[in-house]
């Protein structure tokens, strides 16, 4: 039997400033995993989170 897909899905959010910023504390790109509700949030998610590479709170956008 096939189970129904739930409404909540797991997504990955990535720092937008790590790609363009050259004055970073360390190399790399910050990524977090979180979940979102497909019915309530149909578009791409944007969250302000702490980036350890930029050493600041930056906007993290949802990636595929």
From Swiss-Prot:
SUPFAM superfamilies: Zn-binding ribosomal proteins. The keyword Ribosomal protein applies. InterPro entries: Ribosomal_bL33, Ribosomal_bL33_CS, Ribosomal_bL33_sf, Ribosomal_zn-bd. Keywords: Ribonucleoprotein, Ribosomal protein. It comes from the Bacteria. One of its GO terms (biological process) is translation. One of its GO terms (molecular function) is structural constituent of ribosome. GO terms for cellular component: cytoplasm; ribonucleoprotein complex; ribosome. Belongs to the bacterial ribosomal protein bL33 family. NCBIfam families: PRK00504.1 (NF001764), PRK00595.1 (NF001860), rpmG_bact (TIGR01023). This is Large ribosomal subunit protein bL33. The gene is rpmG.
């Amino acid at each position: 039997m096939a189970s129904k897909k739930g409404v909540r899905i797991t997504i990955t959010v990535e720092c937008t400033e790590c790609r363009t910023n050259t004055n970073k504390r360390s190399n790399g790109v910050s990524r977090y995993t979180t979940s979102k509700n497909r019915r309530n949030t149909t578009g791409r998610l944007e969250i302000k989170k702490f980036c350890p590479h930029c050493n600041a709170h930056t906007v993290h956008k949802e990636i595929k």
